[in-house]
Amino acid sequence: MIHRVLITISLLVTGNLLASTTIIAIDEAFERGELTQDELILNKVYSFLQPELLDARFRGEQTELIKCGTPILIQYEAMQSDLAESTITIIEDLLSPRTDGLRETFFSPGGHFSFNYATTGTGAVPSADADGSGVPDYVEWAADYLDYTWAQEVDSAGFAGPNHVGGDGFYNVSFESMGAYGYCTTSAVDGSELTRLVLHNSYIGFGANQDPEGNVKGAMKVTCAHEFKHASQRSESNWSEGGWVELDATWAEEFVYDYVNDSMLNFMGSGDPYSHPHWGLDHDGSGSYEDYAWEDFMHQRFDGNSYVVAPILEYFWNWRQTHTNQNVMDSYAQALTQYGSSFPEAFGEYVVWNFFTGSRAVVTFGISQFGYDDAGVNGYPTATLATTHNSYPVSSSVTGIENLGCKMIRLNTSGQLGLEIDFDGQDGVQMSAMWAIRQDDNTVDWGSIDLDGSNNGSIVLDVRDATMAALIPVVTQLTGSTYGASYTIELNSLAECDPGDINDDNNLDVSDLVRLVAIILGNGAIPTDVEMCAADVNDDDQSNVQDVVTLVDLILQ
């Protein structure tokens, strides 16, 4: 039983580290029975805190950088009661605040944070002190960024602040040379604090971001927002959400420092809703960093894209305080219901937003006109298409859609009037068939095809003024395996008519009846679009003797 539980936790952490080859290799070795649980967690902790101690099997040519060490430490905490004392001692020693080098303490101007930093040794921060304050600029930056993060996440948005009662009365932060942006830990806390934060001591050599002040400041900013949100989560619900805490902390980067776009540039491209839209939001058992667009959608759609408040996500975390054992997706559904929507309805809109990003973003003068406010920002990913249709009629199908996943189908509309879609989704699954039309005036019309109990339905899209359209089958149920759908798309003339008025003279008489019979028998001139429309008198998508009977009844009325 322990082995099975550990595998589950390991899979969540693997997803959270965005396919770190080292972490994946460690997990796979454990699953093959080649590592004990103690060796598993030791190697994971070594991977970012002391890579030279890694088992030789997991060492690469260069040390891998991970986004966040917190999920590994959450896993360590969950396993702790089953670990050997020697293992705990090693890890606690690695997590203990550093004492080497000449060390100083600085208190943030906002009065919330205490920073312990070294000016000499391997963990020293950069020594530059441009303002001559006697405190390294690097430490002052961190203080400013965390003060601002507190103001945004706690004072403004209403998320819980970290518990830092007792001790020195400040929330403690330190700096380390390590293989992660940072981490939040429950080890070696001061007084009755729940957690403390550790930031990288230089952020030199980290991935590029879009902070106008440079990559170093940008990396520090998003780490402050991210790790501080972990501290808030711990106060809210004791990290009961598993890997979802990483999705939420990455969203916090967008909420606090939206212009930096570090995660967008460095942690997309593998398993996210753009590179793998057919993968479920909870692929491998949990959401993670790369899925932060889900909370970004919830916030922008239901909170008016405020960078001051975030009511729907505040509600979500308040709810989690008393529902720590509830499935996280059910908690999201509860929040959506509270804000006048439902999970299936919101998730259908979410995948439409995801279609119009990157090269398909709807942008005018650099401003997004639909969906995410940064959908057209340089570097924002473009969702992968299952296929593109350029000519019609066409019949096709899609498979391999996981629960909470979709397939995106582009419909080119050049020179077309209407497209008639007949959709046949797999039976026995909660599914939607979303459609969208990008008009040539840079507006987007979208909706869903009305499906019956067998997931069948049809719609005619007016694409006369469209630059493109989309069909997006999406599985909205919370659990399951993989599913599929088939569809047929035909041209539609969009002809307008009055049923039975074959001659289009606003009268129903014998001349209409004669022409109807000729059309059914294939006699006379080829019928026009209006005639074909009017010939379907009983609106069953075909013209036959039943239409003759119906027209006779109408004439005799």
Regions found by a protein language model. Name each.
Residues 272-359:
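Active-site-proximal alpha-helical
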